[in-house]
Amino acid sequence: MSSSCFCKHSEETPLSVLSPELQEQFSDPNHPANLICELCRLFYDNNWVTGTGGGISIRDVDGANPNLVYIAPSGVQKERIQPWEMFLVELPEEKILRTPNDIPKELTKSYKYKPSACTPLFMSCYTMRDAGACIHTHSQHAVMVTLFLEGKKEFEISHIEQIKALPKLALNENTGKIEKIGSMEYYDKLVIPIIENTPHEEDLTDSLQEAIKNYPGTSAVLVRRHGIYVWGETVWKAKVYNEAIDYLLELAVKMQQSGIPTVKQ
């Protein structure tokens, strides 16, 4: 049986120990902290964030301060995460405004929370692409693709209907920003850069930034033998892009096993 998506805490936890402001936030199912809970449960059911792996962050693009970023902590079981367990960071200085360790112990049970090791990579997506959300999964399909492309720097696939779910991006010469100009077409070739894994997650930052810079048309970066980072202009766009890319990665694995090229000649 799959787990419930929404963070059902109203009858199980004493939210009265929180400030009125936080009580209001955590009672709103559309608040970024609750959306992270919802998506973590969904991604867990898809085997993308098992064993405390992976991570997600959401920028409050629809809130009073769109520079606020909510980030799931490191080393927690994603399917059990609660909204008060998020780190709150403000862009562009990347200042930490609140941590789960600031929350009353009645809720956190004195657990010592650590910031996500993905934080500098998430911040790169926000500052370089003005993303509204960034998702990091340990998808087996992502890992498998990087294994059969050992030594290659790119994943490519074309002429698959699902490609239409992904954005077509281009550099705006006036603003200097990468902007969405439409959606990819059936005949377009999707190219996702692959970077090499490192012993520590934060050490991936430079490689990820270089890939984002060198591939202006991408909404994702694969990490060999590790997983994938996907971002989008809103949390729901990032979710769609992640799902579409994972579908294409799974299909690519099966095509490889059947001797079918992923790019139609």
UniProtKB/Swiss-Prot annotation:
A biological process from GO: L-methionine salvage from methylthioadenosine
Pathway where this protein functions: Amino-acid biosynthesis; L-methionine biosynthesis via salvage pathway; L-methionine from S-methyl-5-thio-alpha-D-ribose 1-phosphate: step 2/6
Binding site for Zn(2+): H136, H138, H226
EC number(s) on file: 4.2.1.109
Residues holding substrate: C118
Disulphide-bridged cysteine pairs: none
Cofactor field: Zn(2+)
Enzyme's top EC category: lyase
Role this protein plays: Catalyzes the dehydration of methylthioribulose-1-phosphate (MTRu-1-P) into 2,3-diketo-5-methylthiopentyl-1-phosphate (DK-MTP-1-P).
Family note: Belongs to the aldolase class II family. MtnB subfamily.
Full protein name: Methylthioribulose-1-phosphate dehydratase
Source organism: Scheffersomyces stipitis (strain ATCC 58785 / CBS 6054 / NBRC 10063 / NRRL Y-11545) (Yeast)
Gene: MDE1
